[in-house]
């Protein structure tokens, strides 16, 4: 009797019903020194790890330009790293420790790890510069991140935080501030770099609400640059073209009374 109701392959999706997964692509970032950082990008991803964003490129240029005082010998944490170019450039420029993180999705973390491995030959060994990769969800426990630091620095935290194109996620602003509070070293020279482009210009007021929230959380906010890029990342998107080409850069530091 059961055989009378055998549907066979009636409900099986036909071949080609689902679009094939996009293959990974590759992108290059040419450093001011002339060195080329080549990174792998995931084929597609809802968390945007498939792009080399303008803020990532400009962050890397800023890091390289200010490396002698900002990066060399320092401990650096990048959150929302995607392909990880700013982390890689930090390691190349002599950071003592660099921890590259993004959402703990296996594809994203594996892609970051491949990029870190591919850049190993560019990273100095004297003095040594270590580059680590791990998944991290904003606002969660930071002790696993601090575990990558040299033992004598774990209680203090990181000298530099890199936050490129993360403040677009408005509902995560509180978690971003929490992560800053728990990872940034409470010293005068410790700094969080917050760099972004308003790809959706009509949402810029919501994006900028991050900064008053950070001030309430104990940080000073200083705008350090506004750079107009040559090309739009998304040419057919709506909104003010000039804003969509502009990268804004801010430095956030602990208020004097909280160091």
From Swiss-Prot:
Localization of this protein: Cytoplasm
Enzyme class: transferase
GO biological process, one term: methylation
InterPro entries, per the entry: EFM7, Methyltransf_16, SAM-dependent_MTases_sf
An example molecular function term from Gene Ontology annotations: protein methyltransferase activity
GO cellular component, one term: cytoplasm
SUPFAM superfamilies: S-adenosyl-L-methionine-dependent methyltransferases
Stated name of the protein: Protein N-terminal and lysine N-methyltransferase efm7
């Amino acid at each position: 009797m059961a055989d009378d109701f055998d549907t066979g392959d009636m409900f099986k999706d036909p071949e080609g019903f689902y679009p094939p997964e996009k293959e990974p692509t590759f992108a290059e970032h040419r450093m001011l020194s002339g060195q080329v950082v080549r990174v792998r990008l995931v084929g597609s991803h809802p968390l945007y790890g498939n792009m080399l964003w303008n803020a990532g490129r400009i962050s890397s240029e800023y890091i390289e330009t200010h490396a002698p005082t900002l990066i060399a010998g320092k401990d650096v944490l990048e959150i929302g790293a995607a392909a990880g170019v700013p982390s890689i450039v930090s390691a190349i420029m002599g950071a003592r420790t660099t921890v590259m993180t993004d959402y703990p999705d296996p594809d994203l973390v594996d892609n970051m790890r491949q990029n870190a491995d591919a850049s190993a030959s560019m990273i100095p060994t004297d003095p040594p510069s270590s580059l680590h990769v791990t998944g991290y969800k904003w606002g969660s426990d930071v002790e696993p991140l601090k575990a990558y630091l040299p033992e004598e620095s774990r209680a203090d935290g990181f000298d530099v935080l890199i936050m490129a194109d993360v403040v677009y996620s408005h509902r995560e602003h509180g978690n971003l501030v929490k992560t800053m509070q728990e990872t940034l070293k409470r010293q005068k020279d410790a700094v969080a770099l917050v760099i972004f482009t308003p790809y959706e210009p009509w949402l810029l007021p919501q994006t900028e609400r991050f900064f008053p929230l950070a001030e309430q959380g104990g940080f000073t906010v200083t705008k350090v640059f506004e750079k107009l890029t040559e090309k739009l990342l998304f040419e057919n998107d709506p909104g003010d073209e000039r804003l969509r080409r502009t990268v804004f850069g801010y430095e956030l530091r602990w208020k004097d009374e909280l160091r």
